[in-house]
Every structure is written in structure tokens, then in C-alpha cells.
UniProtKB/Swiss-Prot annotation:
Keyword annotations from UniProtKB, A to Z: Membrane, Sugar transport, Transmembrane, Transmembrane helix, Transport
Membrane topology: Multi-pass membrane protein
GO biological process, alphabetically ordered: phosphate ion homeostasis
Lineage, uppermost ranks: Eukaryota, Viridiplantae, Streptophyta, Embryophyta, Tracheophyta
Protein's UniProt name: Putative glycerol-3-phosphate transporter 3
Keyword RNA-binding set for record: no
Record flagged with keyword Endoplasmic reticulum: no
Species name: Arabidopsis thaliana
Length: 510
């Protein structure tokens, strides 16, 4: 078995059985490179939609499980479910969120390390099916009349591990097929899976809630289990696994430099037969830009996941235009935050490509998050129209940088020039960045569970402070990118060029 610093691959690549099936019905046999790219885009997209859909039931059923939520609940949806129906119900729900997200954060680092060494298709399938089983087991408590707090805690802990497998895998696979030049826009569109998953999960959970809260979990569970099987049958991990040949016209200057995992992976196979080196965990932290973006995402994801887990609950506790909304209506209304997130992710990717500045774009969105949150808290209750507009704007600025950092930025850093094209780092770097962010994601919701009992104003001040710190962490990178825009090539490019003759690449085994 590979150690923490081992660089051995633990698998032999094989063509997915579904690809064999498709090739039998094609006159020319093999699929084209672009067809494989389309397949990868769609499969990874729907896979992570399913992952996020399974996270939404928790936030949707909070008001149903807790009979005595924060504030004076006046809606029609009551009932409660022990042990969450007491005065400390919101705190217990926050602890369950903490258990899930803590294991998710730790598991992300482990999953990323394994993702560069295991068959990504099989590993991703395990994560999806395991997530489906855990999500269903949470809902089974409704029919089995289970009220033990530690049952829910154990299920969410296990679910956190299986969920952590997904992100490093899908980003690594996508990075294997798309070059750096177009990552911003492509991954900006692709990152819509986060918000779409939240929307779909919300609609499924709220639609089934009237039949009993257990169904809110079973629906998304069946979805991700089915899609996990589809992924196993059809997902091509990289061009070599399916013997795909890139058209000469598609190779651009960026790819000739060996920036992408695909090129370095294929070239290494040509020269050595089978390159088994993968970047080590500590070495990945040394890649320029990884640490600042990782800690930036800590605070960015804290804000995003607080909304993910608590927005429907907050809306149900707030009179909008003098009217108290039901749990179902609150859940459906909260999807507008995710609609804004879809637009924000696409805009962030587009602007970052046009400016060639990931940090500038992320920082700009993050700083605009602060007034957006302030306005939503102060004026969101005035009327339904104002609430919708401000919720959309808040979602745009909150999820825009989150989507950019976890996709295009992670893929760029995972194929950084300092690696000199001789190491596999995509899954590891992705895991470091999103794993660090997930620590913040674990802290935000549980803090909200306690702070909301005091005041929702305090919750929003906490979120605005987190956004400010997040933006400040990118200051150095923003300054470097501004200098590059004003004066030409960056200092980093000169350093990398000099390093090619003066020092060896990053030690991939550290």
C-alpha cells in the first residue's frame, strides 16, 4: 500500500465498458477527441450536481425537525422530531453539520492524495454510491422511528467521507481533458453544477417533504446512486485510457509548454513507458499560490456553506413583506441564491480569462460580497421583490469566487510550471484548496447554530468579517497580477524560466 508520500499508482487503466459499447455502434469505431471532451464535461457535471443535491435535504428539513427554532416561528409547518425539537435543537443540528463538514474537510486531503494514485472512475463511483447509501439511511430514521442523536451523527460522519471523494476526482478528470487557456470560461460554466445541484436538491427535498421528511433524503439518494453507476460505465479518465488522439489544430502554445496534465502524462509515458510519480502532499503546498488561495477559500466557503445550510431556515424565520413563509416556500425561494451563484461562477470565469487574473477577479467579487450581505440583511424583509433581487445579487458575489477558486484556480495550480510537467498534482492540489475551504465550511454552519440563537444580525456581521479576511489574503497575488497587467510578463514567469536552468523542479515525493 502506498504511504502518505508514496508516488506509486495503484491501478492499471482500462477503457470503461460503456465506451466499448458505444464504439460497437460507430462505423469509424473510436470516438473523436471532442466527443470525449463533451462526455467528460457532461458526466462530471451531473456527478457533482448529484453530490450537491444530497447536501440540501439537511437544510430543507431543519425547520421540520426543530419545533422550536430561532425566533418565533409562525409558519404552518410544525411537528418536530426528537432530539431536535427541544430548546437546543438548532445547536444539535449545527453539531451534525459540523460532523459532516469536519470529516469532509479531512477526507478531502486523503481523497486528493489517493486520487492521483487510484483509478479515478472507480474511486468516484465509490464516493457516489456511498453517499447515496448514507443519505438514504438518514431518511430511514423517519420510518424506523429513530430518535438517537448519535445515529444521525454517525450517518453524517460517514457521509462526509464519501462526499469528500467527489471533488478531487471530478476536477482532476476535467483537467486531464481541457487545457489552461480555456479553463476559466469552461470551468465557469461547469462550476454551475454547485448551484444547480443545490437547486435540484432543494426542489426534490421540498417537493417530497409533504409525504414525510424521510422522502426528502431518499429522493436525492436514488439520484446519486443511479448516476454513480453511469459514471462507472462511461467516464473516460484521461485520453490515454481510451486511446484518444488530439487533433493537431487543437494543440495550442499553452499545451506545447506541457502545462496540462494530459500532455505531461502522455509525454512521460512515451519517454519512460509509465510515469508513476505523483506530487507529494507537502510539495503541493509549496506550489506558488496554493497556500493563499487555500486560506482564502477557508473564509469564502465559510460564507457560502452558511447560506447552503441555513438560508431556507433564515427565510422561514423572517417576515417578508409582512408575511411569514412556509418551509416549502422558503426552500423554493432560497434557490434564487443559487441561481445567482450560477451567473456569478460564469462571470467570474469569463472575467478571469479576459484579465488573465484569477486573484483580481476573485478578490473583486469577494469585496463586493460585503455590501451585498449588508443590504440583504437590512432590506431583504421589505418586500418579496426586493428580497429576490438582493438574494440573487448576494448569491452572485458569494458563489462567484468560490466557483472560480475551486475549479479554474485549482486546475491551474495543479499543473503549475514549477512542476515542469513531470508530476501528477491535480487531485492533490484540488484537495488541499477545497479541503482547507471545507474546514471553514464546517465552522460557519455550526457557529451560525449558536450565534443565531442570539441574533441574526450577529450572524451577518460574522459573514461580512469572513469575506473581508478572505479578500485580504489575496492582496499579494492581486498586486502581482496588477503589475503583470501594467508592465507585462510577471516576475513568476522569469523565476520559472530561471529555475529551469538553475534548480531542479519541486520534489514530487515530499
Amino acid at each position: 500500500m502506498a504511504s502518505w508520500t508514496s508516488s506509486e499508482f495503484l491501478y492499471e487503466e482500462v477503457k470503461p465498458p460503456g465506451i466499448h459499447f458505444l464504439e460497437r455502434f460507430r462505423r469509424s469505431g473510436k470516438l473523436s477527441f471532442k466527443q470525449y471532451q463533451a462526455m467528460v464535461f457532461v458526466l462530471t457535471f451531473i456527478a457533482y450536481i448529484a453530490f450537491h443535491a444530497t447536501r440540501k435535504p439537511n437544510s430543507i428539513v431543519k425547520g421540520t425537525l426543530s419545533e422550536q427554532p430561532t425566533g418565533h416561528f409562525k409558519g404552518a409547518d410544525k411537528g418536530g422530531w426528537a432530539p431536535f425539537d427541544g430548546p437546543d435543537g438548532t445547536a444539535l443540528l449545527g453539531q451534525i453539520d459540523l460532523a459532516f463538514l469536519s470529516v469532509y474537510a479531512v477526507g478531502m486531503f486523503v481523497a486528493g492524495h489517493l486520487g492521483d494514485r487510484l483509478d479515478l472512475r472507480t474511486f468516484l463511483t465509490i464516493g457516489m454510491v456511498g453517499t447515496g447509501v448514507c443519505t438514504a439511511l438518514f431518511g430511514v430514521a423517519f420510518w424506523a422511528n429513530i430518535h438517537a442523536f448519535y445515529y444521525f451523527l454517525a450517518i453524517q460522519t460517514l457521509a462526509g467521507w464519501f462526499q469528500s471523494i467527489g471533488w478531487p476526482c471530478v476536477v482532476a478528470v476535467l483537467g486531464n481533458w481541457f487545457d489552461k487557456k480555456r479553463r476559466g470560461v469552461i470551468m465557469g460554466v461547469w462550476s454551475a453544477h454547485t448551484s444547480l445541484g443545490n437547486i435540484i436538491g432543494t426542489l426534490i427535498a421540498t417537493g417530497l417533504l409533504k409525504f414525510g421528511w424521510g422522502w426528502s433524503f431518499v429522493g436525492p439518494a436514488l439520484l446519486i446512486t443511479f448516476l454513480g453507476i453511469v459514471v462507472y460505465l462511461f467516464l473516460p479518465v484521461n485520453p490515454h485510457a481510451v486511446e484518444a488522439e488530439r487533433d493537431g489544430s487543437e494543440v495550442d502554445s499553452t499545451m506545447r509548454l506541457g502545462d496540462t496534465i494530459t500532455e505531461s502524462f502522455l509525454s512521460s509515458r512515451t519517454s519512460t513507458g509509465f510515469d508513476r510519480r505523483a506530487v507529494g502532499f507537502l510539495a503541493a503546498w509549496k506550489i506558488p499560490g496554493v497556500a493563499p488561495f487555500a486560506f482564502c477559500l477557508f473564509f469564502t466557503k465559510l460564507v457560502s456553506y452558511t447560506f447552503l445550510y441555513w438560508l431556507p431556515f433564515y427565510v422561514s424565520q423572517t417576515e417578508i413583506g409582512g408575511e411569514q413563509l412556509s418551509q416549502e416556500t422558503s426552500g423554493n425561494l432560497s434557490t434564487l441564491f443559487d441561481v445567482g451563484g450560477v451567473v456569478g461562477g460564469i462571470l467570474a470565469g469569463y472575467f478571469s480569462d479576459q484579465l488573465d487574473g484569477r486573484a483580481i477577479t476573485a478578490g473583486g467579487f469577494i469585496y463586493l460580497t460585503i455590501p451585498a450581505l449588508f443590504l440583504y440583511r437590512i432590506y431583504g424583509h421589505v418586500s418579496m421583490t426586493i428580497n429576490i433581487i438582493l438574494m440573487f445579487v448576494a448569491g452572485l458575489f458569494v458563489n462567484g469566487p468560490y466557483a472560480l477558486i475551486t475549479t479554474a484556480v485549482a486546475a491551474d495550480l495543479g499543473t503549475h510550471k514549477s512542476l515542469k510537467g513531470n508530476a501528477r498534482a491535480l487531485a492533490t492540489v484540488t484537495a488541499i484548496i477545497d479541503g482547507t475551504g471545507s474546514v471553514g465550511a464546517a465552522i460557519g454552519p455550526v457557529l451560525t447554530g449558536y450565534i443565531a440563537a442570539i441574533s441574526w444580525d450577529a450572524v451577518f456581521y460574522m459573514l461580512m468579517t469572513a469575506a473581508l479576511i478572505s479578500g485580504l489574503l489575496l492582496t499579494t497575488l492581486i498586486i502581482e497580477e496588477v503589475k503583470t497587467l501594467l508592465y507585462g510578463s510577471s516576475e513568476e514567469d522569469h523565476e520559472v524560466a530561471a529555475a529551469s536552468t538553475s534548480r531542479p523542479p519541486i520534489d514530487v515525493l515530499i
